[in-house]
């Protein structure tokens, strides 16, 4: 039998997923969306408590480069080299393309960019990301994060601390009738939920 995590979509490309081997996209997403960087902690914006650098730039649109201390400017230059911000002649830091930030947000939140999203927007942006090696095409039905979710609940292939319901219930001799009834009920509802999600993904 085929594992749920291996089911293919009928589409040649269902998602564009983060290339786990590419360090540039990993660094870019960290600098844009991590709340652990200090890129938002500058006057006069630090009192606004922006979640991350992307959140700040989407709200203020431009910040003075010289408002950053010297040790943070190299980080900004890294983002310049990665092509997501620019430093103009007037000394202001600005976003190169706001739509790019939308794509980066999808990658950060979900790990993928749906192919239908790119078709609907009809841009060549995805080709740029592919050429840079930042994303890879995928024909899987489930995204990598969804695959992890299913693997956690169904087997011990990717995790060693999950319920592994498939492993447990596929072999009746491993299920004791004396087991907690609430536990069986919870497992039953959880597997129903997993089935519903899978059906929705197929319908989608």
Indicate residue ranges for each PLM-predicted region:
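A short, conserved structural fragment
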Residues: 76-90
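Short helix-coil junctions and helix-kink-helix linkers
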Residues: 55-69
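A short mid-domain helix/strand-loop element embedded in enzyme catalytic domains
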Residues: 26-59
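Accessory beta->alpha helical hairpin/"wing" motif in late/C-terminal subdomains of nucleic-acid enzymes
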Residues: 88-115, 167
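Preference for solvent-exposed, low-hydrophobicity sequence contexts
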Residues: 1-35
